[in-house]
Structures are given as C-alpha cells and as structure tokens.
Amino acid sequence: MNDLPSDAEIARINAEHLISTPLRPADLLFVFGGRYGVDETVAAAVDLWQRRFFRHAIVSGGPTQGIARTECAVIKGGMVKGGVPADLILEEHRATNTGENVLLSLPVIDAALGRQNITSVICLGKICTARRYPMTLHRHWPEVDKMLVTINPFDAPVERWHTDPAFRARVMQEWRKIEPYRVKGFITDWP
C-alpha cells in the first residue's frame, strides 16, 4: 500500500476526516483514551472545563503494553490535577479500541447519569482518528448531538500532516479503516 497520498486524496482527507466542529456547551465530554498525546489530551480537557464546555466527562481507556495504570487512570488524574472535579469524571478502564471505548462506556454513562438525560456530547481524541470518534459514537448512540475536538501530538501542524512520516502513517491507517468499518457496521455516517 502506498502511503504517499495524491493531492486529491489529501484534499478529500482534509475535507472529510480531519475535521473539527463548532463548539457549544455540552452535557458530556467523551475522552477517548490513548498513551500517545496524553499531555495534549489532558490540556484540551482542562481547557474545555475552564471554558465551561461540559458538565460531566467520561474517560475511557484500558491497560496498554504492560503499563500498570490504565489510560483512563492516567488521563483522569491529569484532568483532576488541572482542576476538573473528580466526581464529575466517569471512568471506563477496559477499552482497548475506539469501538470498545463506546460500547463499554455507554452502560457507565447510563448508570451514573441516565443516557436519556444527555443531549449533547463533545468527543475528544487524536486528530489522526478525528471523524471516526463521532462516527463510532453515532452508530451506538444516534440520539445525542455530537461535536468533535481533536489534539495534535505530532511534530507537524494539521494542515501539513502529509509531510510528516509518522503523522501521515497514522492518518492513512485511520482513514483506511473507515470504509471497512462502515461495511462491518462498526461505524455509521456522521454528520
């Protein structure tokens, strides 16, 4: 597979995948875990809290690569240190991928808050996965309004993603998942 995208493919990825949405205050911030870009994820969540963009949060992410603390524990710890009240952050400690982030978090959200009480969600995760976060959430929770905030843990700015080998590889890997995941029913079109 050639990882050097054409100009047309770059334009399509920029328009369809590496997106952000206008923000408004939401009932819930859904933080998709990961080990790469933790500091940026925490900073974005704290910034959203300080600007009063969410009332509750859920952090989802399990253990990775033999590290004792889960992604959830690491990210939540950083959010609390940054000033987000611990009791407003729900926890999901088992997920190992985006689909599990959603599937394992929904019962936690339902038990703590009642899904019927949530009308809007901000998805927070890495830019390389971008649109796939709300597409996955939309597949399993279509009723809520979804917004997207992404962090960029790479050395290149987002508009130059295709010039950085690591950034390009991750974007292309995530971009190539969309159609097979759509066919398998893991995600659905959004918006």
List each language-model region with its residue ranges.
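A structural signal for short, hydrophobic/glycine-enriched beta-strand patches
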Residues: 1-171
